[in-house]
A protein has these predicted regions:
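Residue-level recognition of pore/gate-forming positions within transmembrane alpha-helices
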Residues: 12, 20, 144, 160-161, ...
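Transmembrane alpha-helix boundary and packing residues in multipass membrane permease domains
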Residues: 20, 24, 82, 125, ...
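Alpha-helical transmembrane segments of integral membrane proteins
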Residues: 2-3, 102-135, 151, 178-328
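Membrane-water interface segments at the C-terminal ends of transmembrane alpha-helices
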Residues: 22-29, 62, 76, 142-173, ...
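Hydrophobic alpha-helical transmembrane segments of membrane transport/permease proteins
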Residues: 16-69, 165-187
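Short hydrophobic, aromatic-rich alpha-helical segments embedded in or entering the lipid bilayer
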Residues: 48-80, 275-287
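An internal, D/E-rich "acidic patch" concept
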Residues: 62-121
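N-terminal signal-anchor/signal peptide hydrophobic helix marking the start
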Residues: 6-12
Length: 328
């Protein structure tokens, strides 16, 4: 097992370099660059653009360098100094911008993940064991609603309900009176009171999807010969269901780690913009729109690394959970 892990880690190194090169290339495919966007914005607002200043900025930012020179400078800074470059739009180091958003991003995403698993697991088991019952039809209906309704529509609906009927301020993770205030018990309580909306919204589609997957997998397992034999031998029903069928049907929950880890960082971008959440998703979106190449490239590289780590973790956990995978 250790040899397998070491080999997978070695494979990750060239994969990350390839992903960084492709992402850096894709970011530069649209015509123009950050300075082009800035000049267009200044011209639209009636400001004069000094050509000499533009040339000086191109020299400072290295826009006149060939593509491969820009890429090598960026990737060498990451490897040698942990320097992800400089954000043109924000005027700050990229690493500081990214890590400043990580706290709220991880809190919201991890709680959303727990919400998904806590809700989806019992409902999925119930729907598989009590197929075509009234409860199964109700959960199926709401599951399809959760899959069909866009997250930002659900966000607008819950914002209206929270403001209209609960008297809660909408948008952000704190009430206006706590904006910029130091952390205190009152601010923590207000923060927790605002968390339920993004947790439900971000977790809705994932919960609905995992319920359907778990229901289908567990239904298939419950009709296999070993389950029929266990029932014939008189094992209690809860043991028949929970000991092996549920354990095998949980594989999708574990394999989901491969896409959950990057999702923890990027989040649901449109929903975060609607809710005005201080997470990483809106920052990545803004960097892509403004062609802030080092900020956008660093985000994509981070998401790629988390995807590879998530796939490795899911493979290892699946091997521990399911002996069939371990032996193969």
């Amino acid at each position: 097992m250790l040899g397998y892990i070491f080999k997978r880690l070695l494979y990750m190194i060239p994969t990350l370099f390839g992903m960084s090169l492709i992402s850096f290339l894709i970011i530069q495919l649209p015509p123009g660059d950050y300075l082009t966007s800035m000049i267009a914005t200044m011209s639209d607002s009636g400001q004069t653009v000094d050509p000499a200043q533009i040339e000086r900025l191109k020299e400072i930012y290295g826009f006149d360098d060939p593509f491969y020179i820009q890429y090598l400078k960026w990737i060498w800074g990451i490897v040698s100094r942990g320097d992800f470059g400089y954000s043109f739009e924000w005027g700050q180091p990229v690493s500081g911008l990214i890590w400043a958003r990580m706290g709220s991003t991880l809190v919201i995403s991890l709680l959303s993940l727990l919400f998904v698993w806590i809700v989806a697991l019992p409902i999925g088991i119930y729907s598989a064991v009590r197929r075509h019952s009234v409860g199964d039809h109700v959960f199926t209906f709401f599951g399809f609603i959760g899959l069909a309704v866009p997250n930002f529509i659900l966000a607008l609906t819950l914002m209206y309900v929270a403001y209209k009927y609960l008297g809660q301020s909408v948008g952000g993770l704190n009430s206006p009176q706590y904006a910029g205030a130091p952390w205190s018990f009152a601010k923590v309580g207000d923060f927790l009171a605002h968390l339920w909306i993004p947790i439900i919204i971000i977790g809705a589609s994932g919960t609905a999807a995992l319920i359907r997957i778990l229901r289908a997998n567990l239904t298939d397992e419950l009709h296999k010969p070993y389950v029929i034999t266990a029932r014939a031998k008189g094992l209690p029903e809860y043991k028949v269901i929970l000991k092996y069928p549920v354990r095998i049907a949980l594989n999708p929950f574990v394999s989901a780690i491969g896409w959950v880890l990057p999702h923890l960082v990027s989040g649901v971008t449109i929903t975060a913009i609607v809710l005005n959440l201080p997470t990483a998703g809106p920052l990545l979106f803004r960097a892509l729109v403004s062609q802030d190449m080092y900020l956008a490239g660093s985000f994509i590289l981070l998401l790629s690394a988390l995807t590879l780590v998530g796939m490795l973790l899911s493979d290892l956990l699946l091997a521990l959970l399911d002996p069939r995978i371990r032996f193969n």
